[in-house]
Design a protein with these regions (language model features):
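Cofactor-binding active-site loop characterized by glycine-rich and histidine/acidic residues
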Residues: 55-172
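N-terminal amphipathic, basic-rich helices that act as targeting or association modules
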Residues: 6-92, 257, 261
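Conserved small/polar residues in nucleotide/adenosyl-binding loops
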Residues: 283-290
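Gly-rich Lys/Arg/Thr-decorated short loops/hinges at beta-loop-alpha junctions or inter-strand turns
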Residues: 16-22, 44, 48, 112-121, ...
């Protein structure tokens, strides 16, 4: 990830970003070009919001995730629901609104939040926080043939509405991916080689296949099955604070590095075709706005 110490005053050179008119264009890139695309997207976001005003922090924290999600999923057929509209600035830029991004918060300009009437890529009109899981749950249940993703921050997860939706998700078990965008030290302390290694294992199809076949066999031996399940849960708890997700019936992966677009595409890509509710947490450095 390229780090910027100040907001660019001149229009940056962004050849890769300039080639992206719709998310489908991202799929034409080589995977090793995604990091460069994310760097260009971050620099362009800094430049445009620096000129027009707006909220930088939330958008900067999801640059790599935005690139990864649109690279992996088939938008707008698949649904991406953003919690807190300020996260959606990068999403707007790569969904055909790059030239208009400077009009955010201006008369007759782009909305500062996702708006359904503005773009087919904005699947839910969001403003305030903590609504994404509920909205995404309804979409996932209503149309199970689509992939549905909710992106929610750690602050928004403290609201009762989010927990209620999380509990309901565990009960209904739809094909829904919940991504927790976290910049708090309580999770970031766990980010490292061991955490990333296990995250890749738990998100792999090989692990899922072994787990599924092993479960069928071990269920015939109740005492052994419960022991193995407990060990698995404890191992996940040692390297990732996902106990609450697991207890509510969601498969939990993470935390992973939210500034590593290759790791995001690998882990989330592996989860794409899994059945049932999945949850991933990722950490990032929060931008300081002045």
């Amino acid at each position: 990830m390229k780090v910027f110490s100040e907001i660019p005053k001149d229009l940056p050179n962004t050849p890769l970003l300039d080639s992206i008119n719709i998310p489908e264009d991202i799929k034409k890139l080589n995977k090793n070009q995604l990091t460069a695309l994310a760097d260009e997207l971050r620099e362009f976001l800094l430049y445009t919001v620096g000129k027009s005003g707006g909220h930088l922090g939330a958008g900067l924290g999801v640059v790599e995730l935005t690139v990864a999600l649109h690279y992996i999923f088939d938008t707008p057929k698949d649904n991406i629901v953003w919690d807190v509209g300020h996260q959606a600035y990068p999403h707007k830029i790569i969904t055909g609104r790059k030239k208009e991004i400077e009009t955010i918060r201006k008369k007759d300009g782009l909305a500062p939040f996702p708006r359904r009437s503005e773009s087919e890529y904005d699947v839910f009109g969001v403003g305030h926080s903590s609504t994404s899981i509920s909205a995404a749950l309804g979409m996932a249940v209503g149309n199970p043939n689509k992939k549905t993703i909710a992106v929610i921050g750690d602050g928004a997860m403290t609201a009762g509405m989010a927990f209620e939706a999380l509990s309901h998700t565990g009960h209904l078990k739809p094909n829904l991916l919940i991504i927790l965008n976290d910049n708090d030290m309580s999770i970031s302390e766990n980010v490292g080689g061991l955490s990333n290694y296990f995250a890749r294992i738990w998100a792999s199809k090989l692990y899922k296949g072994i787990k599924k076949s092993g479960k069928s066999f071990l269920e015939k031996l109740p005492q052994t099955y419960h022991l193995v399940r407990k060990v698995e849960t404890q191992m996940k708890g040692m390297v990732a604070p996902g106990t609450i997700f697991e207890e509510l019936g969601l498969n939990y992966i993470g935390p992973i590095d939210g500034h590593d677009v290759n790791e995001l595409t690998e882990v989330i890509g592996n989860l794409k075709d899994f059945d049932g509710p999945q949850s991933v947490s990722y950490t990032h450095l929060r931008a300081h706005e002045t």
